[in-house]
Every structure is written in structure tokens, then in C-alpha cells.
């Protein structure tokens, strides 16, 4: 199995890789389990790609471990009873991976796969008259798909009675969630299908949701200077994340989950609670907090004017100018 360490906040990838190495050392010494480091924790370029590390699978471990270039990074280096029992593991430091499914108005796995092949980086095998075209080394040639850092396959989901395209977005700084959704919609339309929504498996970074909202707001030529809560609502509706079941941001956005048990801050108070706390016997909030709040209200009024202006009839050509000022207000 794999154990990736993913930096979320206040830590670099380099620091995360060091923790991955420490974890691997402990797994090897304390549990007696062998394994490899991959991606940003890899000890060689050959081991960066997880698919390469996994090649041969469990059945090929005995042969793999006999090769000098596949000596494990941690744990026993020889094939033994422990490896027979537990196999090996892979530990890494990597960027956030999003497991993301796009819903279709179809039950056809074949059509879903065709769209997946259009989009995923690995694309599809090159065919001539139904036969695979081979390169000079005898390997099948491939026609690359539209998006980088995307793995995908089509399948039928019995639970919902629809076909989906199941994606792994392996680097959302290269291909974002909304790009995958948008390009899938384009490819589906070309094939006579329609995208009805999408589904997240697991958690998603807040920034991915905000970026999705900004993408669709720009397409609508609407102001980007709106609140975080409003952007989350727009992202949910634009991507159809509530198509199959309710989408609760507090349970699905990783930053919200991490902060759920955090102590309540002044910024989280309602106006009434803030006023009552100010009037209490405690020394804080005091004059500084009150001045900051009054200043914030002034900025809010400015942002309101910018947002209203961005959507004003006859000022369509200036929406981006006003949107920029509204964003500064936020």
C-alpha cells in the first residue's frame, strides 16, 4: 500500500520529504516492513513515479528485490517471510491528489471511456484499421489526451444508475478540478452526451474551490470581489457537486475540517456577540479592534459599490475594472 504525506499549510515540500524519510526509517526498523520512497521523497529519478515503483506488483517482488537497482529504501533488503506476509509499502511527499468523478447523462461505459481517453494525459492507443500501431521497439504508440497530470477511466455506477468518468488529478497546479470538468463537458458535448454534475471522493483544498468559482465568474463576466462563502456556493453549483447527494463544505473542504475544533476567534463572532464581548469586563476587544472593524465596514461599502458597478447595465465593458477593485476590498 502507499502512505503519502501531503503538505497543507505552514510547511514546505522539502520539510515534508524529510518527515517521509523519518517515517520510512521507523516503519522499517519498528515494523520490519520494507518499502520505497516515491515522488518528492524519491531517492532516485527511477523511483519518482509510483507506477514504476509498483511495477511487478506483489507477485513480482521476489524477482524485483533480487535486482541491485531495486533494493528497498527502508526495512529488510532480502525477500523474507515478513515480505511474504506484508508485501512492501511506498511512502512519499507529494502534492494534493484529487479523486474526482464527472457524471454523464448516459449508462454507456464505452462512451464514458471514450471521453476519458480524450482527456487523460495517457490518451488512447493509436489504431490504424482497428490494429494498434507499434513503435520501433514494439511498444504501442499512443495519442495523448487533452490534459496533463490526469488519469481517467469510464465506468458505470450501479448505486446511481449512471456512467461516470473517474479521474485522479495528480497535480492540481497543472490541471485544476474546474479545468477537468470544463474539458470533459466539451468532449462529452462533441460525442452527443451531457455532463450533469460531478462528485468529489474525499477532501478538497479550499483554493481549488475558490479557483473554480473565479473561473466561472470570469466566464459570466461577473465580479470576483465576493465573499468566500458565496464563492463556495458558486463552485458547488458550477461543478454540480450536489448532483448526486448533498455537498457540505464544512465536511468536504480540508481547511474547514481542520479548523472545525479550533477556538472561536473574534472574526467569527456575530455583530451582536462582538458588541456584547466589547461591553463585557474583559480588556479585549478594545479600541484597536473597534477601529479595525469600523475601517472594515468602510472598505465593505467600497466593495459594494464596485460590485454593483460591475453588474450595472451599460457598463459591461468595465466589469473587469470594477471586479479588480471589489477583489481588493475582499
PLM regions: where:
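Long, contiguous binding/interaction regions
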Residues: 2-273, 280-281
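Conserved phosphate/anionic-ligand binding catalytic regions in large, soluble enzymes, centered on
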Residues: 4, 279-305
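A structural-propensity feature for long, helix-poor, extended segments
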Residues: 311-330
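Short, well-ordered loop/turn and helix-capping segments at boundaries between secondary-structure elements
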Residues: 121, 190, 299, 303, ...
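Short, flexible helix-adjacent loops and helix caps
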Residues: 8, 283, 306-314
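Short, intrinsically disordered/low-complexity patches at protein termini
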Residues: 188, 219, 309-310, 315-316
